[in-house]
Amino acid sequence: MLIQLNKLNIVNEGYTRNISISKIYVNPAHVVSINDYSGARQFLIAENATQYVDKDFCLVKMHHGDNTEEIIALGTSEEVFNSVNSQLSPSERKILNG
């Protein structure tokens, strides 16, 4: 079963950056770690993306075969963890929890 996350997209367009949020679907078994990401707020303020400044973000690290991918997701690490954890089997939860 896949879970839905809201990903912060940052597209460099030369002198400006286009910042948006889009829905993505992730296999929860591929999630390696989830950490709160306070650096997003300062970046959004610097980029004048004030519509997202009052939101919380976390860094989600996922394993894809030979490589890992990090995304900035909307929500606290606890909120995203609860979403991921609710879709995992008990044996997979044990691995995620350490």
Spell out what each predicted region is:
Residues 1-98:
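Eukaryotic intrinsically disordered, low-complexity regulatory linkers and tails enriched in Ser/Thr/Pro
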